[in-house]
Design a protein with these regions (language model features):
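ABC ATPase NBD coupling module
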Residues: 71-88
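Helix-to-loop junction immediately C-terminal to a conserved catalytic motif
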Residues: 54
Length: 211
C-alpha cells in the first residue's frame, strides 16, 4: 500500500511544530513493503498521524492519498472496507473492552488474516496464553498491550500502524513482540509505520522521521 502526504497539516498544530517536522507540510511517501519509524516527544502529533492514515480523523489541510486516490473522496463504506481488509492499527490507548476476556477482544475482528499464526500461537509467543480467558480489566497494562497487538496482527493488512506499541513492555517482551511483528510483516508483504517516544525497537526500518 502506497501512502502519500502532500503538505498535510492537522488542526490544530502549533506553527513551530510544523516547521521542525519531517512529516507535516511536506511531500512524503510511505512506500509499499517498507518499514517507517516516526519518532517524537509527546504532543507532536504521532497519534494524530496514525489516526489520519486510518481515516478516523479528517481535520487536516493538504492531500492524503492511498494508492493514488485522494482520501477526501473516499466514502464511509470505502473506509470500512479498507480497515477491514487493508489497514490494521494498534491504538496508543489500546481500545479494548474491559468487561470482555482477552480472547473475546481478539475475536471481535470480523475477518481473520489467513497468513497469521493462530491466536493461541501468537499469544504463547508473547507470553499471554494463560491470560486469554481472563477479563481485560484484571490484566496489567503490559498484558493488555500484548492482547491489543495480537488483535492487530490477526486481521488482514497491507499496512500496519502501531502507536507506541512497546511503551509498557520490558526488554524481553519487546524483543518477542518485535520478532512477531517482523514475521507477520514479511509474510503479508506489508508496510509498517511505528511511532515511538524515542526508543528504537529491534525492527529494521527503511526510513526514520522526526515530528
Amino acid at each position: 500500500m502506497r501512502i502519500e502526504l502532500n503538505h498535510v497539516v492537522p488542526y490544530p498544530l502549533p506553527k513551530e511544530v510544523i516547521q521542525s517536522s519531517d512529516v507535516w507540510d511536506t511531500k512524503l511517501c510511505f512506500k509499499p513493503n517498507s518499514a517507517s519509524l516516526v519518532s517524537a516527544q509527546s504532543g507532536m502529533g504521532k497519534s494524530t498521524l496514525l489516526h489520519l492514515l486510518y481515516g478516523v480523523r479528517k481535520d487536516f489541510s493538504g492531500i492524503l492519498s492511498i494508492d493514488g486516490k485522494d482520501s477526501s473522496t473516499l466514502s464511509r463504506e470505502d473506509w470500512i472496507n479498507i480497515r477491514k481488509t487493508s489497514i490494521s492499527i494498534l491504538f496508543q490507548d489500546l481500545r479494548l473492552f474491559p468487561h470482555l476476556t482477552a480472547l473475546e477482544n481478539i475475536n471481535l475482528i470480523p475477518v481473520a488474516n489467513p497468513n497469521a499464526p493462530v491466536v493461541e500461537e501468537m499469544a504463547d509467543q508473547l507470553g499471554i496464553s494463560s491470560f486469554l480467558h481472563q477479563s481485560v480489566n484484571t490484566l496489567s497494562h503490559g498484558q493488555r498491550q500484548r492482547v491489543a497487538l495480537v488483535r492487530a496482527l490477526v486481521k488482514p493488512f497491507q499496512l500496519l500502524l502501531l502507536d507506541e506499541p512497546f511503551s509498557h513492555l520490558d526488554d524481553v517482551n519487546q524483543s518477542k513482540a518485535s520478532s512477531l511483528i517482523k514475521g507477520l510483516i514479511k509474510i503479508n508483504g506489508a508496510s509498517l509505520i511505528l511511532s515511538t517516544l524515542g526508543s528504537v525497537p529491534e525492527i529494521p526500518f527503511d526510513q526514520t522521521y522526526s515530528l
